[in-house]
Amino acid sequence: MGDKQERGLEFFSKVLGEDNAAGMREHIGSSDFGKECGNWAIDFAFGTVWTREGLDRKMRSCAVLGMLIALRQTDEIKYHVRIALANGLTVQEIEEVLYLSVPYAGFPAANSAKAAMIEVLREVEGEAAG
């Protein structure tokens, strides 16, 4: 395993939890269909881009959420809301990212994102309650 992959898995574990990281380790070490997509995500997205200097993790989360809203990638938004919370964003800050997207990405994209965000925030609230 290379340095980028190690950094990527370490970051992945910090923001999505050790159970998810263990699942990703298993997937990228397997012969499963699409495993290279997982390798690329860990090596490039998490091991190279997310771990760069220049922006803190909160700023990166804001930027990624904004892009995902504009692209209407609601499944990815769900992951990245959890990542944003792990990176220190508050629910109010995530809500402001949503509001900022409206004049640039439009109401339909923002409304789709809002539904995905609410779903995840309710899950997180339920997990915290026990």
Regions found by a protein language model. Name each.
Residues 33, 55-58, 76, 93, ...:
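Residues at the start of alpha-helices and the adjacent loop-to-helix junctions
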Residues 105-106, 121:
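A short hydrophobic/aromatic micro-motif that marks alpha-helical segments and, especially, helix-coil
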Residues 41, 45, 62-67, 97-104:
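Short alpha-helical scaffolding segments that buttress acidic/His motifs in well-ordered protein cores
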Residues 1-57, 86, 112-130:
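Acidic, glycine/proline-rich low-complexity segments that act as flexible tails and inter-domain linkers
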Residues 107, 111:
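Substrate/cofactor-recognition hotspot
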Residues 62-95:
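Mid-chain, well-packed structural core segment of small domains
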Residues 22, 55-56, 61, 77, ...:
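A generic structural micro-environment signature
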